[in-house]
């Protein structure tokens, strides 16, 4: 059982699994979820509400964030290699020290509607 905490609300989401790798979060409301340190490789976040989510020090290789709402997400020091962020909505995120192995997550399969972002890749 994995227990995901949410900022400010003191709420939790319990997932009956031993790993989040490959987990399908599509369409879920994960506003303010703390996903720091989990392995999210291959996870699906299609049309997921990820506003103010924290994904720090996390592997998200080959994860799918297609059409996800990523406004004000904190994505520091995470590995997004091979992840699909196409058509995701992102305003005000912090991408400090994201490891994308030289691939551009902003163009191509990157984020759309990007502004006010601090890049340090």
Predicted regions and their residues:
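Tandem repeat scaffolds
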Residues: 1-121
């Amino acid at each position: 059982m994995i227990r995901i905490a949410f900022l400010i609300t003191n709420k939790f989401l319990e997932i009956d699994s031993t790993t989040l790798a490959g987990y399908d979060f599509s369409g879920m409301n994960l506003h303010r979820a703390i996903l720091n340190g989990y392995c999210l490789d291959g996870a699906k976040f299609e049309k997921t509400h990820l506003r103010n989510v924290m994904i720090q020090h996390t592997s998200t290789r080959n994860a799918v964030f297609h059409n996800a709402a990523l406004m004000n997400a904190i994505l520091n020091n995470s590995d997004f290699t091979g992840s699909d962020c196409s058509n995701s909505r992102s305003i005000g995120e912090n991408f400090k020290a994201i490891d994308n192995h030289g691939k551009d997550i902003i163009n191509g399969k990157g984020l759309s509607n990007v502004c006010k972002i601090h890049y340090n890749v």
